[in-house]
């Protein structure tokens, strides 16, 4: 059958077939709401379903049906105020002809319930149909691999599991009056759906994390990257353990440094900040940081910052001066309690809004200037987390005072609660026996440093302790990476599957708890146990943890695996033939890649 690459009508049909070509179910009248390079997305309400037996019924609740292009699954999402229900079908890639989406169903399905329980179903049916329909090995391998991929999507909350993916579509449906229903059961559906969504954002079960972000006036160095790599590991560990997370990482795009760079270069502040924000996003991609949910910028939120300062003013915490507005720290009980005696000497009121004659000016109650640095983070936390207390507020150890102390003071003033349950002050990165700093000129740009080496260095260090970058430290990290690469290649070579058992979860829990020392101790125990016993279950545990750590080398090994598997098999073949000269040629290819 020849597939068409476009959709002709607003409403289409869907047909599901068995492997022998029998049509077993059809959906009539599904509405197309999106068709782009990645997905076709349908909206089902009052669509009619017909079974092979002749039985038919009408869809009685709204749902989305996502058909990723050239993938071996599709996703049905039942929209419910109490929480969406996912039903994922393992299938052939769909084709489109005669105004109909058509696919072959491969029996196994994955269900994800509103409270995030996950279940794999119809495995027995799949095993039965391997015999009845004669599924070839390629189909069986594809199905098992796709299940692993989908479980990984779920663990990382990516793709259609990401919090914004479905909610953005539902927002669009609501705006287009497509969530208005006559039945009593569905009355006020849109209102109830979004009320529950807001409640869920406030729900204590959400693991709430905020990390102070960079000032985008220059390229970031590895010292800047330490906090975000560490927090990404912690957040992904929480996701792996079943927690719903919200991770916010701000971008400071108003600052004296940006203004000075603008004056020197005669390039606008906006162009400078946009340039280095783009560069920062490239570095985040290189370091495989994917857990960040929101990255608010100061320039996009000036009005909100003004309202936030006004709310502090109404409560009597703001003092007007000739050159701006400051926060009265004397009104905050225990302000500076955690400070050293030396720091306490520096305690003073801090600017919420400062008048300025340089750079772009913004208006606060007739005063032209810009917001103070300490207010932006407080506003973002207050706004995005609905005035709730964070689980973790992270940043470099140098932000402890005054930045974090002043954030907390403002939050207490507005909300009568502390800004966070736990502070995470990540240690500094030292180079040439000094803190890595652009002003000292002793930086290693993040784009020039190997991201896997950096992650190994961080994992093998206490989160709050300083790290001294030396050649010896880098070489030690390379040794560990080479060890992990060999283990991971062997895992793939044996066609093993990832493990999500208590042994793996224990190690992931240590990452979530910021106990990197215990994590390394346990992982090395399993590596030693495997090297001694060569038991597949030990290798599976180790490789599952290595995969969780999300190294770049994993992607490369998986990408080249088919080619290197052939090289490995040829090498083994020559060994059996005792043709050691040719065997060594192929062995060297694998050694050069660090795979054996």
From Swiss-Prot:
Q: Mind listing the UniProt keywords for this protein, alphabetically?
A: Aminoacyl-tRNA synthetase, ATP-binding, Cytoplasm, Ligase, Metal-binding, Nucleotide-binding, Protein biosynthesis, Zinc
Q: Which cofactor does it need?
A: Zn(2+)
Q: Name one GO molecular function term.
A: cysteine-tRNA ligase activity
Protein name per its UniProtKB record: Cysteine--tRNA ligase
Subunit structure, interactors included: Monomer.
Kindly list the biological process annotations in GO that this record carries. Answer: cysteinyl-tRNA aminoacylation
Source organism of this protein record? Mycoplasmopsis pulmonis (strain UAB CTIP)
Region (Unknown) residue ranges read 1-199
Q: How is the cofactor bound?
A: Binds 1 zinc ion per subunit.
Localization, per the record, is: Cytoplasm
**PANTHER family associated with the record:** CYSTEINE--TRNA LIGASE, CYTOPLASMIC (PTHR10890:SF3), CYSTEINYL-TRNA SYNTHETASE (PTHR10890)
